[in-house]
Amino acid sequence: MTLDRSTIWPYDEHGEPREFYYSRYATPTVAEAETRVGELDGGAALLFPSGAGATSALVLSLLAPGDTIALAEGCYYGTSVTFGALEKWGLRLVEFDQTGPPPKNVQLVWLEAPSNPFLTMPDLEAAVAYPAPVVVDATVATPVHLRPLEHGADFVLHSATKYLAGHDDALLGAVVSRDHAAADALRVFRGRTGIVAAADPAWLLLRGLKTLELRVRRQGESAGLLAERLRGHPAVEVVRYAGFSGLLSFDVADGDAARRVETGTRLIVNATSLGGVTSVLESRTRWEGDRVPAGLIRLSVGLEDPDALWADLESALACA
């Protein structure tokens, strides 16, 4: 783990650039983190300053004005917002049920495994049978549970801010490509547009990857236990859990009840995001409006004692 904050490096003795010469194109720390992420997913990885940055760079490098993206319904709200911002450049967006095949006549298929916050899993086999490139946002699954490139996907995307870095202190995104030529083209695009990751968050990512599997498996065990207990609670109407990972969502009666629950916890932090060592929950209507049920609460389970988390949830649910 090397933390090199330099922005320039000297040329060689012949006056030619070495592997690292200007930080907009490559840095030792970012390159080390990319190698590690690529090993985990089985492809060629590139880092970006955020998940949204990774999404924008990948889409803009692959598509042209007039092209259409098929986006999984109920996907992460931020992804739909990013794509909406790109529509002014002539890109079109259609949403589809990712548990079935994508629509025809699209130039890119975008899946989530599982979706956030509805926790549906895509039909990868149906998607990769389609001729358009397939991107799988595997932020929630992580390479611990799913390596989409092994199932025929062309690209994997991670908001590395979440589980990969895992400590709520590093903002990063990652794209992993099955094809090294496609990764090289994206690397050129990244350098030309300046959508580049810095050394410090890349170093924090390297730190987080050391404990990735331990964290993710512990979070998944605790989330499974909490999902089971939530299903038996009288104030909870619906529980969504994919059977792995530390993310789940559940519905209470309405938006007012959801606000009382989210502000009623003491151990679980009322905050956004997911995948960190600290458990957080929030009412998602705050951001997503009528895209989600009014009473939907998203819970990202951290590394705390699951019985203590349940006691905290029970106390908050008494206010629902």
Q: Model regions: which residues?
A:
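Conserved N-terminal alpha-helix of the aminotransferase class I/II PLP-enzyme fold
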Residues: 2, 8-57, 61, 74-85
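PLP-dependent enzyme catalytic core of the Aspartate aminotransferase-like
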Residues: 85, 93-95, 215, 279-320
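Short conserved active-site loop signatures built around small residues
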Residues: 1-4, 175
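Conserved C-terminal alpha-helix-loop-beta "cap" of PLP-dependent enzymes
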Residues: 242-297, 301
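Short amphipathic alpha-helices in soluble, non-transmembrane regions
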Residues: 186, 259-266, 312-317
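Conserved glycine-rich beta-strand-loop-beta hairpin in the small C-terminal domain of fold type I
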Residues: 2, 223-224, 240-249
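Conserved PLP-enzyme active-site core in the AAT-like
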Residues: 44-235, 240
